[in-house]
Each structure stands twice: as C-alpha cells, then as structure tokens.
C-alpha cells in the first residue's frame, strides 16, 4: 500500500499500518515530483506523488496506480529528481548508472528497462547525487562467495536507455552478486 505524508524527516516508527503490513521504503521528495520503481523483472513504473493518498489512512494498493504482472514485486524505488542518479545492479554482476529522471514512463504497464539473464534478479537500487556518480565516489560489490571488489563509480557510464549494463564484477559459476554499497568519506561501507 502507498501513501504520502507532507513534510520531511518523519519518524517512521510512529506510523501505523494494517495488520500484516509494514514499512518497505520511504522516499523524501516534493509533492509535485514523480517517483519510479523497478520490479524484479526489470520493468520500470512511474507514479505522480500528488496522486498518492494522504498519510493518515491506510493508503491505496500499488495495483491501483500501475499494472504489475502477476506475482511481480518492487525491487526498489527512485525519486525522479533531475539532480539524482541511481546505481542499478543485477545478481549476475552487471549494472549501470542512470539519471533518475531518465527512467520515467507514462505507461501504466511500465516499460522494460533492465535486461536480466536467466535466474537473475535486481538488487535494490542506490540513489545518490548525480555529481557524486561522476566524481570520486567508490562503490563496493560483495559476491556470494565473500569476494569484495571496490572501484570508482565514475568508471561506469551513465546510461539513459537501460539494457544489460556493464560488468561490475566477474563471477564464477554458481556465484552471484549479493550486495552493492557506496563507500563513505571515511572508507566505511
């Protein structure tokens, strides 16, 4: 279920939910903005924040806004801020950097954006300022066999069209990428 609250800096632990529901994600953005999300099949969908129900009720189901294929689940959310970028990575070790504003679509059924290989899934996207994606920002990739690779994010080209992306980490047979994180100024992941 989706809902919008006015203002920033809300304490999410104080929000109430229906029995069996809980908080999945929060995005701070303007009420005039759009937000996008990717599903596990690599399709992207866009919602107008102004169309979301207010934060006092239980919200509305995601299916009221978009036509998700049966069984599809959101893999992650991105605000459509023109000054934001997002890192999109698959469990197969491929990924891309994109401008958050480039993933928007008007189609209620969404559009294909990320091409996934057999048995691959999307890792949650990482949103960051566009300047950081083109600067000295480091990114760390962790594989299922506990191999860690850290490299400058500026080595990854910014794309607007999606697709497979480039190789973030070469994986052995049966190995998958399990986590991707930005390295902060202190070198912590």
For each predicted feature, which ranges?
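Short, structured "edge-of-domain" segments at secondary-structure transitions
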Residues: 1-189
């Amino acid at each position: 279920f989706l809902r919008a609250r006015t203002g920033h800096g809300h304490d999410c632990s104080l929000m109430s939910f229906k029995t069996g529901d809980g908080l999945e994600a929060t995005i701070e953005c303007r009420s005039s903005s759009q937000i996008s999300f990717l599903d596990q099949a690599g399709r992207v969908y866009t919602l107008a924040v102004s169309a979301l129900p207010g934060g006092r009720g239980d919200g509305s189901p995601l299916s009221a806004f978009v036509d998700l294929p049966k069984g599809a689940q959101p893999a992650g959310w991105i605000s459509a801020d023109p000054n934001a970028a997002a890192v999109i990575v698959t469990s197969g070790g491929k990924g891309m950097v994109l401008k958050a504003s480039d993933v928007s679509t008007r189609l209620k059924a969404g559009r294909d954006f990320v091409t996934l290989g057999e048995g691959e899934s999307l890792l949650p996207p990482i949103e960051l300022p566009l300047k950081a994606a083109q600067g000295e920002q480091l990114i760390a990739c962790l594989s299922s066999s506990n191999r860690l690779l850290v490299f400058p994010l500026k080595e990854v080209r910014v794309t607007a069209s999606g697709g497979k992306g480039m190789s973030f980490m070469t994986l052995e047979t049966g190995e998958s990428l399990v986590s991707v994180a930005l390295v902060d100024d202190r070198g912590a992941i």
